[in-house]
Curated annotation (Swiss-Prot):
SMART domains: Aamy
Annotated source species: Schizosaccharomyces pombe (strain 972 / ATCC 24843)
Protein's name in the database: Uncharacterized glycosyl hydrolase C11E10.09c
Annotated binding of substrate, by residue: 94, 133, 214, 219-220, 244, 307, 355
UniProt similarity note: Belongs to the glycosyl hydrolase 13 family.
Keyword Chloroplast (UniProt): no
């Protein structure tokens, strides 16, 4: 394989092989699509805006046209109904009843029709699940009788907000939230609680035919909870471990198949929003450290945006920086996640401004960012189909300096920089040092220009700080 690092497949659940091939599109159900088109309906705020499962079903072709192959939807269970100082539970993370659906999103039949429609389009469906906590509005004492099935105080840790998020005990037993909305912390260490969740998730997967799970606030749940829960679910599960240190997050992969790649997320934001941030540092922290501390980086879920952080375009209007960051996201080791609205260059700030109604974009598929992103995603999917080893062969560094990083994966060479649209770069790489067979030319997928490779030397030139995604003209060059 010519110096390219790989993680050879071992005996593992079949769902890992399946999910390595995916590009995930994250949807906030309330904010993606209404039952009927109304492009001028309210599209901001912290109240329910009317997005539904039917709305997603009607607009699956939009996601499909972007090239994404899996859809992650919001938590589906019934949430508290109060309007709090922080708004309503439109996001789905303030549960009240684990045994009922959130009627704001639709009916059981609507949900089943959505998952079935996703499958008919040869896509996968991932559901967001919260096992750590319930939701409570205001500062008054909690009436635990209102919750199902955990309708007694004995199922919850004593009230105390988390103060030190680096303290393992406090992180597990403390409550999240504040005096406006606090989140009663479930005693997930109790056997009867674990048994409920095992039966519940098994039934949930069978009833709705979900293909995967995103496990919210996994950092706040005992690690010993996960193995039996994962066994009961028997589908791909990625956990939210909100921490930038790969040593901290990587330890969770001993208990979970996958985690969200927060270490990469923070490095992507720092590197591509600050030209002073060295690519050497990016490579050390986002590539080498992640490989060192994680058991299998090929199943980590990578992201540049999500519902908890300001949009990338809120921090910069430089399209070149965004394209470079997205190129890294899509082609680095792991499974890419696109947060809805990235393709429309949404630029909202902190919650709830980063949770815009997508209908305000009129689901435009002709804008430059949508086209560029679609081209990248489809290129990745073509590589997955052409090179069976693409999903487990790790990226290999070809060149690096303070502002430019060039790496390769089967069938493609990627060059990214973080100096923005006012910059340019030029790199020459002798491919003979890395491969026995060297193609005569490459195609730049963003410009569709052919780049010759003379005497085994590839000259990569970029104007306006744009990334280079170079596809070999010879499929056997690896």
């Amino acid at each position: 394989m010519n110096l390219i690092c790989s993680i050879l497949p071992k005996k593992e659940p079949s769902y890992l092989k399946l999910w390595r091939k995916q590009v995930i599109y994250q949807v906030l159900t309330d904010r993606f699509a209404l039952d009927e088109d109304n492009f001028y309906a309210k599209a901001s705020g912290n109240l329910y805006l009317g997005g539904t499962w039917k709305g997603i079903t009607r607009n699956l072709d939009y996601i499909k046209s972007l090239g994404c192959t899996a859809i992650w939807i919001s938590p589906i269970v019934k949430n508290i109904s109060e309007t709090t100082d922080c708004g309503q539970a439109y996001h789905g993370y303030w549960a009240q009843d684990m045994t009922q659906l959130n009627e704001n999103f639709g009916t059981e039949e609507d949900l089943k029709e959505l998952v079935n429609a996703i499958h008919e389009k040869n896509m996968l469906c991932m559901v967001d699940i919260v096992v750590n906590h319930m939701g409570h509005a205001g500062s008054k004492p909690v009436n635990f009788l209102l919750y199902q099935p955990f309708n007694s105080g004995k199922y919850y840790h004593n009230w105390q907000f988390v103060q030190n998020y680096d303290d393992p005990h406090e992180t597990i037993t403390g409550w999240l939230g504040d005096s406006h909305v606090n989140l009663p912390d479930i005693r997930t260490e109790k056997n009867e609680v674990r048994k409920f969740f095992q039966n519940w998730v098994s039934d949930l997967i069978k009833r709705y035919q979900f293909d995967g799970i995103r496990l919210d606030t996994a950092k706040h749940v005992e690690k010993s909870f996960f193995p039996t829960f994962i066994e009961a679910a028997n589908v791909f599960t990625t956990g939210e471990v909100f921490h930038g240190d790969p040593k901290v997050v990587g330890d969770y992969q001993k208990y979970l198949p996958s985690t969200l790649n927060f270490p990469l997320f923070f490095q992507l934001r720092e590197t591509f929003l600050d030209p002073k941030h060295s690519m050497f540092s990016f490579y050390d922290k986002a590539v080498l450290d992640v490989r060192h501390y994680f058991k299998d980086v090929t199943v980590l879920c990578n992201f540049l945006e999500n519902h908890d952080f300001p949009r990338f375009f809120h921090e910069t209007k430089d399209i070149a920086l965004a394209l470079n960051a997205l190129t890294a996201l899509i082609f680095m080791d792991g499974i890419p996640i696109i947060y809805y609205g990235q393709e429309q260059m949404f630029d909202g700030g902190s919650d709830p401004d980063n949770r815009e109604g997508l209908w305000k974009s009129k689901y435009n598929t002709s804008n430059p960012m949508f086209r560029h992103l679609s081209s990248m995603i489809r290129t990745r999917q073509n590589l997955v189909e052409t090179y069976p080893e693409f999903t487990y062969v790790l990226s290999f560094q070809l060149y690096i300096d303070d502002s430019v990083y060039v790496f390769t994966r089967p069938g493609v060479i990627i060059a990214i920089s973080n100096e923005g649209s006012t910059s340019s770069f030029k790199v020459e790489i002798d491919l003979k040092e890395h491969w026995k067979e060297v193609p005569s030319s490459f195609t730049d997928i963003l410009t569709q220009k052919t780049i010759p490779c003379k005497d085994h030397k590839l000259k990569i030139k970029s104007k306006s700080g744009l990334p280079k995604i170079l596809i070999s003209s010879d499929p056997s060059f690896l």
